[in-house]
A protein has these predicted regions:
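K/E-rich alpha-helical interaction surfaces of small helical-bundle regulatory domains
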Residues: 22-39, 138-145
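Well-ordered beta-strand positions
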Residues: 45, 91, 117-120, 142
């Protein structure tokens, strides 16, 4: 009986640890830089040790809002933005998820080198830093509850 109880406690501890602060997997609200309003929700998943992100919801006053990626130059041109994978195959490097051309901005159709990490002081915030050469811009996404 004690052995079974210990196994259950250890299993619960492992589950809690997997969902502890710093876990990047889940849904994140993206914030419009200009308005400060929530723009979309991106669901981040891990598969085969790599990180992926898909737009699962868009916010707009128009209930029929369902835009296409008109600025994309590749196989995503003309595809719906909702359901689009915008984070592709990032790898973990020293506590940050990184990738060359790892994130797509569907507003302009451009790919950027990227680093993504959960904020150390507030695990409800995700720092998403896009790079062009040495120049970068960091957005803060908010964990969906």
């Amino acid at each position: 009986m004690k052995k079974a109880l210990i196994i259950v406690v250890l299993a619960l501890m492992a589950t809690v640890t997997a969902h502890a602060a710093g876990d990047i997997v889940g849904k994140w609200k993206t914030i419009d830089d200009g308005t400060g309003e929530v723009k979309s929700i991106v669901e981040i998943t891990k598969k085969g040790g790599k990180l992926y992100g898909t737009i699962v919801q868009l916010f707009n006053e128009d209930p029929n809002y369902d835009p296409l990626c008109t600025e994309c130059k590749d196989h995503l041109k003309g595809k719906k933005i909702k359901g689009m994978q915008i984070i592709d195959g990032l790898t973990l490097d020293d506590g940050q998820w990184v990738g060359d051309d790892g994130i797509l901005d569907p507003d302009n159709g451009k790919y950027y080198d990227v680093k993504i990490w959960v904020d150390k002081e507030d695990d409800s915030k995700l720092n998403v830093r896009g790079y062009i050469g040495f120049l970068y811009r960091t957005q803060t996404w908010i964990r969906e509850k």
